[in-house]
Amino acid sequence: MACPWNFLWKLKSSRYDLTEEKDINNNVGKASHLYSPEIQDDPKYCSPGKHQNGSSQSLTGTAKKVPESQSKPHKPSPTCSQHMKIKNWGNGMILQDTLHTKAKTNFTCKPKSCLGSVMNPRSMTRGPRDTPIPPDELLPQAIEFVNQYYDSFKEAKIEEYLARVETVTKEIETTGTYQLTGDELIFATKLAWRNAPRCIGRIQWSNLQVFDARSCHTAQEMFEHICRHVRYSTNNGNIRSAITVFPQRTDGKHDFRVWNAQLIRYAGYQMPDGTIQGDPANLEFTQLCIDLGWKPRYGRFDVLPLILQADGRDPELFEIPPDLVLEVPMEHPKYEWFQDLGLKWYALPAVANMLLEVGGLEFPACPFNGWYMGTEIGVRDFCDAQRYNILEEVGRRMGLETHTLASLWKDRAVTEINVAVLHSFQKQNVTIMDHHSAAESFMKHMQNEYRARGGCPADWIWLVPPISGSITPVFHQEMLNYILSPFYYYQVEAWKTHVWQDETRRPKRREIPFRVLAKATLFASLLMRKMMASRVRATILFATETGKSEALAQDLGALFSCAFNPKVLCMDQYQLSSLEEEKLLLVVTSTFGNGDCPGNGETLKKSLFVLKKLTNTFRYAVFGLGSSMYPRFCAFAHDIDIKLSQLGASQLTPVGEGDELSGQEDAFCTWAVQTFQAACAAFDVRGRHHITIPKRYTSSVTWEPYHYRLVQDSQPLDLNKALSRMHATDVFTMRLKSQKNLQSPKSSRTTLLMELSCDDSRSLAYLPGEHLGVFPCNQPALVQGILECVVDNPGPHHTVCLEVLDDSGSYWAKDKRLPPCSLSQALTYFLDITTPPTQLQLQKLARLATEQAERLRLESLSQPSEYNKWKFTNSPTFLEVLEEFPSLRVPAAFLLSQLPILKPRYYSISSSLDHTPAEVHLTVAVVTYRTRDGRGPLHHGVCSTWFSGLKPQDPVPCLVRSVNSFQLPKDPSQPCILIGPGTGIAPFRSFWQQRLHNLKHTGLQGGRMTLLFGCRHPEEDHIYKEEMQEMVQKGVLHEVHTAYSRLPGKPKAYVQDILRQQLAREVLRVLHEEPGHLYVCGNVLMAQDVACTLKQLLAAKLNLNEEQVEDYFFQLKSQKRYHEDIFGAVFPHGVKKDRAERPPGDDKL
């Protein structure tokens, strides 16, 4: 074969035939030179906006230390300008890139779409070969590399150069390939690193140590070379960059490959329950190792073995000697608990699965390493959701508000994780670089490269660190991405292309071809559609205010999807005409206020309740959610049930009732299963006795102690953070400023004015009429009594964490319902110990009774007929249950896993933030009552009793709950009537304080505000009496009317009586003649009586019938002119009312 001299550059004597030119943007010397037509610009690189006229153009190129390979004189390009301007938007500097004209491969971006963020683009990936590269393709690439190599010398070596070209040419002609010299290999590996556009640490490219392993023949030899590499590079923590190059590819059938993605990596195991132990990124490779004979250890940080392939033969497995793997345990300079996370990472990042291309030759096995940038571990390895994913756990341990993104908890947590990584590596004297320093070093490298080569290939998406963004200099730097030769390419995974010689060693798990998988998926989809179409359709409707009903409706849909074709809809999305086509209708709804439906059920309710008849007969079932403290418990659900029955629909099961105060979830599960079974029978579902339903509906009524264990934990309790996480809300601390009994000494009852203050006024925000949620503590006597009954009390001050055994019995998992705390803290702050146990809890307690009689009694009480009578007669606390059944052997784990969560108590705020900055005032009636018709034990309201025992500066954990439907009119001139007996006066105090503030500071005189108050006796419980009189004198309140129910010698008077007798004309003026507002706050019975009285007044004055007055009231509520803030007032059965100071339902719901 003749020597292809047309590939040779001109002699170096012409190398410096350049003209100097100063670029004021670059502030560096430039040189103009012409380019050969053999290397013409691809139009894709042309700078937009450059005018092309086909004339010769003088192009800039750096003159300082220009490599010889870039300084050859060439003919002018007839296509476009040879340079592209690259701007730094941080400092305004502009660089001129000419190196991109040497690019070897077209990127896969399309004319109308950018693929720059694709992880492994085709242009950067090399697949396997079946045949050698043809000599006529190989020779030009070989000569070009020889040119690059000899151009790198400062002094021209013309004779050596020509001789080398001739040698390479003859070698290719004779053998079809050629071999690099040792020096050429060193040059190629370094230059390939220099050309790597995704590497931020290239400033060290010339310091790469090269190990030549091209004489290797077996996998054992490969392993020995790799061990030498790891030992050299690790260097006791002083990491050194290195590469080991194994034999080059020949015909594609004798490849040397390292099957590992990195030399050192941690295993990832798929556990039976679907969770992943270890590094999820390595699941597939770990399974491959197991299939090839590796014995897994199922730890979080198990170093994977090496799988090495030599000369195209089947791979062999090698365990890396533990003494070669340097690992760094993670700790934090500030947080001692960080060490308890048990994290560590290996010190050596050695990429093992890339291919080195140089001069047309391919080296498919060339593991190389640098050293870590901290974010590679701290952000990607530890925090990525698809990796170890520790971000939320760290955020919780830091006490951050992980339930709200706006708290920026992710940013704060990831920063501390990176601090820990850097600290740990530096403490162990292991080389690592922070991302800011790495970004600065790359910017220096980039400037050097533009001066030396006229360009620097760079992938912006990869080079900008995963945190800090625009505060790193690389963020603001425009970059040009292209592929030069030599280059490190990605490869297809070796196990996907390897041709096995020994079929018995082939891994059992094989990937399903995409086409087969797609066909199978399509077939399964068609089958599923056919199956679902053949099933009975079921419509599930929900109406909700808080989202609870929607969640249960979705759960019900999951249950019914086992045998039906369900569709879950909100009531406001449902067309009433669809009732004529229904076969099965299920309804899950809450009851809002005084028996009303939630807002998103109003439209359907109005349409349904005026419907006279249906021609379609279908089956239905209804489940209601509510609170038994209200007299119309689950009223809307019962109303729907009655209406559907009247329309001719057939009831499938009786109405289910879920009580917010006790066992709502248990009641729903029981009703759902009964309804599902009844539906299966009614529609004759085939195989209904063998249907597998979701686990939550099949949970056992037994409590197995061996499924739970307590482990010691050193994490201190942060109460606010724990409450925030448990209740998914922002909890903040206020402190008691003062406490005052508003009732006179003559009264046997207590109503407290609680004044709470906040240190940081900026964190406190509320409007008059809104609620303050308070997280109380249980009574110490109750807590201590329960602790004395626990059979395995871990100690009052021992912090413990509950762990639950996985269903497979293979591992323990932390129960995240409660934070790590002592048992005493759990019973004090987090667990509800005053609400009577549910039926399911009684069944579980029965298994813990050692006396047969008590066990039978508990089982009997768990039945509905006995349970309700026992519950409402005794209303027992958990301690009273333990005292009633003394043979119960209750372990601590039972309490932590089975007792319900203590809920916050809500109170109407009695102050205006404008009038009393940084303060919240509450009006609290202290609750005490006796059960069993006054003969039972004395019970105390949880929150009100806790309030009464507080001292000034004691902390009060709180949250603010917005009540949009109970606020002052947006137009302050509109008249108002305020009706609030007893503590129902609470929000109205905030109203008059706000009006007083407006009057003082803006001179704004609001519209008429009439107050109607009710109490027993003017000398006992007329709370805020003087304050009301003051507001009348100042013109804030127009009138104040008071109803007294216990005046000696006079008939009892209630607010509805005053309303009827004295305010009928005012009601008509406010609600009918003017666009005014009427507010009612108090217990539900009073609110019901007030509403009835108002309807009577309006019906009489406006001559309306019953249906018209109901519609009138509906319009008032729709216009948000009739406002209610009501709470339960139903005493437990058997409570002696004249001895009760306030019902347990005083705490707002």
From Swiss-Prot:
Binds 1 FAD. Binds 1 FMN. GO terms for cellular component: cytosol. FAD binds at H771, R905, Y907, S908, T923, A925, Y929, V942, C943, S944. Regulated by calcium/calmodulin. PROSITE patterns: FAD_FR, FLAVODOXIN_LIKE, NOS. Zn(2+) binds at C109, C114. GO terms for molecular function: calmodulin binding; flavin adenine dinucleotide binding; FMN binding; heme binding; metal ion binding; NADP binding; nitric-oxide synthase activity. Residues 729-969 form the FAD-binding FR-type domain. SUPFAM superfamilies: Ferredoxin reductase-like, C-terminal NADP-linked domain, Flavoproteins, Nitric oxide (NO) synthase oxygenase domain, Riboflavin synthase domain-like. Keywords: Calcium, Calmodulin-binding, Cytoplasm, FAD, Flavoprotein, FMN, Heme, Iron, Metal-binding, NADP, Oxidoreductase, Phosphoprotein, Ubl conjugation, Zinc. NADP(+) binds at R749, T928, T983, R1016, S1045, R1046, K1052, Y1054, Q1056, D1089. Pfam families: FAD_binding_1, Flavodoxin_1, NAD_binding_1, NO_synthase. (6R)-L-erythro-5,6,7,8-tetrahydrobiopterin binds at S117, R380, I461, W462, F475. InterPro entries: CysJ-like_FAD-binding, FAD-bd_FR_type, Flavdoxin-like, Flavodoxin/NO_synth, Flavoprot_Pyr_Nucl_cyt_Rdtase, Flavoprotein-like_sf, FNR_nucleotide-bd, NADPH_Cyt_P450_Rdtase_alpha. Polyubiquitinated; mediated by SPSB1, SPSB2 and SPSB4, leading to proteasomal degradation. Residues 514-534 are annotated as: Calmodulin-binding. Its EC number is 1.14.13.39. L-arginine binds at Q262, W371, Y372, E376. It catalyses: 2 L-arginine + 3 NADPH + 4 O2 + H(+) = 2 L-citrulline + 2 nitric oxide + 3 NADP(+) + 4 H2O. This is Nitric oxide synthase, inducible. It comes from Cavia porcellus (Guinea pig). The lineage of its organism: Eukaryota, Metazoa, Chordata, Craniata, Vertebrata.
